[in-house]
Amino acid sequence: MSQTQPFLARVANGSLVIQIIVGIVAGILLASVAPESAISVGFLGGLFVSALKAVAPILVFILVASSIANQKKGAHTNMKPIIMLYLFGTLMAALTAVVMSFLFPTTLTLVAGNATASPPEGIAEVLNTLLFKIVDNPVNALMSGNFIGILAWAIALGFALHQASDATKQVFHDMSNGVTSIVRFVIRLAPIGIFGLVANTFAETGFAALAGYAHLLAVLLGSMAVIALVVNPAIVFFKTKENPYPLVFRCIRESGITAFFTRSSAANIPVNMQLCKDLDLHEDTYSVSIPLGATINMAGAAITITVLTLAAVHTMGVEVDIATAVLLSVVAAVSACGASGVAGGSLLLIPLACSLFGIPNEVAMQVVAVGFIIGVIQDSAETALNSSTDVLFTAAACKAAEAKVASPNIA
């Protein structure tokens, strides 16, 4: 027994990233050697993702309400620069995707799509959906994982509790610590969950179905890599005036890898919250910016919408001028910010973007079907970029604010 405890302690306190890498390798090996067994352990991945999704809504609600209720007068949360970074980053992602699509034009072999969900008819419908999510029933928002609604109610409750007694505020603070402890335990299970996810994915698809769309995937993943490794670091450097890459690589390593395999920005919120805490960021800031980022910071979605739309344009032989391409970037960026309010996410916003070029809805839905075929990779990479950027921009804004306070005379 005395030997077992140190071993378990070493596992519990060991490097989570190394354990996740071991889980990935083990999952690939199991899928290669025994596909049936790999499929059977897929439930481990499902359990892990479900646990993250279950704890995320209550974590956001309690943490936001507690941080706002306990916020001291005159405290700054840096939310304005973070939101500006989110929006600017999403627009830059769409513009980068346009450039990549023109440099490496893609044509598609369209397939008959069986996507039964209805795409939105316009940006107004997307924005309308988001507005109604804000005034959702709080219980329903928690049950359905509607983070816009959860944020709205948590912020309102936090402000309402500003005048509450210290004892009441302490209760929320203690609840926040309790939920955070539960989240920390769930995150330690990531290696087991990712092992199940990887094993199941490799055993079921083998990625053979993706071979016919190698060029499209190369443009998609190339655009995301440019954003993650060139554009985002440039934005962070401009904001912080220091080497951005240590922070960039840490966000990719500790947030992006988990998000890649869970394929859910909502499920990755607890992971991002923990990373922000490890980075010693201000809780009043990240408790709001991280769930907000999971809703509106959608660089990956903007890339997906733009690349697949321009692939449809090239396939149909439609001529595109620079002005229309820029307009597409804006539409893709605005649509991407509303992607969380659409069933099917970024893929079902493709018909909306295709309508700019007069492409029939039937053809656009075939492009959506292609998106579902490559979704194993596309959705994973998109989520990894979206989620890791939430932490990156939050940290950049916090560091810039700290530097400004430390050197008030420097512009």
From Swiss-Prot:
GO terms for cellular component: plasma membrane. One of its GO terms (molecular function) is neutral L-amino acid:sodium symporter activity. GO terms for biological process: serine transport; threonine transport. Its main location: membrane. It catalyses: L-serine(in) + Na(+)(in) = L-serine(out) + Na(+)(out); L-threonine(in) + Na(+)(in) = L-threonine(out) + Na(+)(out). It comes from the Bacteria. The chain crosses the membrane at residues 14-34, 43-63, 82-102, 141-161, 192-212, 218-238, 290-310, 330-350, 357-377. It is a multi-pass membrane protein. Keywords: Amino-acid transport, Cell inner membrane, Cell membrane, Membrane, Symport, Transmembrane, Transmembrane helix, Transport. The keyword Chloroplast does not apply. The keyword Transmembrane applies. It is found in: Cell inner membrane. InterPro entries: Na-dicarboxylate_symporter, Na:dicarbo_symporter_sf, Ser_Thr_transp_SstT. It holds the Pfam family SDF. Belongs to the dicarboxylate/amino acid:cation symporter (DAACS) (TC 2.A.23) family. PANTHER family: PROTON/GLUTAMATE-ASPARTATE SYMPORTER (PTHR42865), SERINE_THREONINE TRANSPORTER SSTT (PTHR42865:SF8). Involved in the import of serine and threonine into the cell, with the concomitant import of sodium (symport system). This is Serine/threonine transporter SstT. It comes from Photobacterium profundum (strain SS9). The lineage of its organism: Bacteria, Pseudomonadati, Pseudomonadota, Gammaproteobacteria, Vibrionales.
